[in-house]
Amino acid sequence: MAYVLTETSAGYALLKASDKKIYKSSSLIQDLNSSDKVLNQFKIAAFSKFSSAANALEEANSVIDGKVSSQLEKLLEECKTDKKATLVVSETKLANAINKLGLNFNVVSDAVTLDIYRAVKEYLPELLPGLNDQDLSKMSLGLAHSIGRHKLKFSADKVDVMIIQAIALLDDLDKELNTYAMRCKEWYGWHFPELAKIVTDSVAYARIILTMGIRVNAAETDMSEILPEEIEERVKTAAEVSMGTEITPVDLINIKCLAEQIVEFAAYREQLSNYLSSRMKAIAPNLTQLVGELVGARLIAHSGSLISLAKSPASTIQILGAEKALFRALKTKHDTPKYGLLYHASLVGQASGKNKGKIARVLAAKAAVSLRYDALAEDRDDSGDIGLESRAKVESRLSQLEGRDLRTTPKVVREHKKTEITEARAYNADADTVSSAAAPADSDDESEDEEETKEEKKSKKDKKDKKRKRDDDEESKESKKSKKEKKDKKEKKEKKEKKEKKDKKSKKEKK
């Protein structure tokens, strides 16, 4: 006797096969190509219906995990017989789990049984009475969605893609704002160059352009909403004595359009920064408490997702963002970097140069713990208590290394010097002519300078002459020496030749 266990979206179905060796015969499997043949081959022996959609999801997850649920075990116990029967199962893990139950079944699960399941699934509505095709497809679709949600553990508040896109857009906005602000200052600087030195903030600079227009309107313009009183006075004072050129109304219109873009971009950047902060507190509250919103968001964006970052060890988190320097150091066999993106965290910034690496290592270890709690904790907790505790431990370690209490350094506000208006200097015509009193003195100085230059030239000329004479003497000595050597060589050669001739003559005479 052979049974086929079929898991459907409506419940468990146990089908009895007319041929007990169907799983062994390939020809029988190929014959299951019509509904009549399938209905003749399989009859329903038992059916265990799922009570609800939640129950269906639970049972489906049990089958996927290879576990035998109590409902399935009850169904198999009801159908077991005295004789050992064959049970065809689709999942290998589930087959092993059923074997461990000790029921009187020979459980089979291999590649051949897949063809049986393909035929059974195709004609399932005909095999199960009381279930039509439309109802079964609706139940299957609902169960598939439930399984997908369960696997993904989907939550709208936990979507880290929003953080990745937000931090990337924030960086792009910063670049655009800097470019636009620089262009605006250069453009308007032709008309009012002193304004850029007085007002350093780009957004305030753009708002002044929109409010004031040309510098002539500075005295009548109210800038109290944009600037403090002292700086406003300095701007108005500088506008009265500005050295800038005049611009046409068309120029001003275009400059104002650029200033409007800067103000709008700055407002949107602030809105995006607030959005990123709220998203980070929702997705990774403990990491946010430990390293801050921007550093945390950059870590998540660099690794790709919160889960992949949570799976990374502390050593990887420590040097995340410094991969280029790491591989260069490994290639050249130099010291590896001590920190990457964590360098921008406030705790690392508070440490002195020699302790930055140690604090980065401690911070990375605590960040790894916080990340795993944020990403993998079953009970959601947005308080960030673990992050606060970890931060306190890192601060205590930093105090121990630095030997001082951690205190937030107050921001130093520079006092702006007031611009004082001085009377414009009149043109002095006497400055263009040489006064009679100063003329003799100037002429004496000039004559002295001329004498000094003459003496310097004479001394240089004498030195050159001496050097040339010395060189000539040396050359003459060398030439005399070389001539003498040549003469001696010639005489020696002549003597040698004469001697050889004499020897030859004497030899001939002897013969």
From Swiss-Prot:
Span of domain Nop: 283-403
Could you tell me which SMART domains the record lists for this protein? NOSIC
Give the principal location in a single coarse category: nucleus
Q: Where is this region: Disordered?
A: 398-511
* Annotated SUPFAM superfamilies: Nop domain
Query: Which regions are flagged for Acidic residues bias?
Result: 442-453
Q: Where is the composition biased (Basic and acidic residues)?
A: 398-408
* CC annotations in GO: box C/D methylation guide snoRNP complex; nucleolus; small-subunit processome
Q: Which Pfam families match?
A: Nop, NOP5NT
Give the GO terms filed under biological process for this record: rRNA processing
Q: What's in the keyword line of the UniProt record?
A: Coiled coil, Nucleus, Ribonucleoprotein, Ribosome biogenesis, rRNA processing
Gene3D superfamilies in the record = 1.10.287.4070, Nop domain
* Coiled-coil annotated residue ranges, if any: 442-511
> Which Gene Ontology molecular-function terms are recorded?
snoRNA binding
Can the keyword Calcium be found in this entry's annotation? no
In this chain, composition skew of type Basic residues spans 460-469, 480-511
Keyword presence, Nucleus: yes
The record's subcellular locations are: Nucleus, Nucleolus
Which family is this protein grouped under?
Belongs to the NOP5/NOP56 family.
Q: What is the protein's known function? A: Required for pre-18S rRNA processing. May bind microtubules.
Return the protein name.
Answer: Nucleolar protein 58
Species annotation: Kluyveromyces lactis (strain ATCC 8585 / CBS 2359 / DSM 70799 / NBRC 1267 / NRRL Y-1140 / WM37)
Q: What is the lineage of its organism?
A: Eukaryota, Fungi, Dikarya, Ascomycota, Saccharomycotina
